[in-house]
């Protein structure tokens, strides 16, 4: 509907998966078996059951912190050339790690999150909007309330299951601007 109403640009949505390490795969399988056993014991997926909830939470956290996620994201950034990227990570630690790696690879990037004071956040945002930076890395600080029409690429390195959050994040780069023909969302 939004594309037909001409409020967003044409875009390509690329689904990519960072494979887990063998150790992570094994842990994932163990968590899954434990979840299945617990669900069978309590007679189903009762999300009010604290042990079941914790097993599911810990499995999801392990996936979110997979060792290959950041290197894979860097590889995708290098492979898919765009004028400017917004990279949304799972947490501040991942944002810092991703930013450090891509700066070493020659990208002009900065972090935008609540660890920075307001002046530094504003400076990083303005530098991105002006084109002085070509990558802005954040976790949840850019989820809602920010328009970033300058960006023509978005990389979502977090594994949110919230449809609303995914739509909000994609919307950061889909706004129409005079110089943008299309956008890429990874």
Regions found by a protein language model. Give the residues of each.
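Class I S-adenosyl-L-methionine
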Residues: 29, 96-103
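Interdomain helical connector at the RecA1-RecA2 junction of SF1/SF2 helicase-like NTPases
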Residues: 1-82
């Amino acid at each position: 509907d939004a594309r037909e109403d001409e409020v967003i640009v044409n875009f390509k949505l690329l689904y990519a998966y960072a494979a887990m390490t063998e150790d992570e795969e094994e842990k994932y399988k163990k968590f899954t078996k434990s979840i299945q056993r617990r669900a069978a014991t309590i007679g189903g997926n009762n999300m009010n059951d604290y042990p079941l909830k914790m097993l599911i939470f810990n499995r999801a956290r392990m996936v979110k912190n997979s060792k290959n996620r950041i290197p894979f994201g860097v590889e995708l950034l290098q492979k898919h050339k765009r004028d400017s990227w917004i990279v949304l990570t799972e947490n501040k630690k991942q944002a810092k790690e991703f930013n450090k790696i891509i700066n070493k690879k020659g990208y002009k990037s900065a972090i935008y999150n609540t660890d920075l004071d307001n002046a530094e956040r504003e400076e990083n945002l303005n530098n991105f909007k002006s084109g002085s930076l070509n990558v802005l890395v954040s976790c949840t600080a850019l989820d809602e309330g920010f328009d970033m029409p300058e960006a023509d690429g978005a990389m979502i390195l977090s594994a949110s299951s919230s449809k609303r959050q995914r739509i909000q994040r994609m919307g950061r780069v889909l706004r129409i601007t005079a110089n943008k023909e299309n956008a890429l969302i990874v």
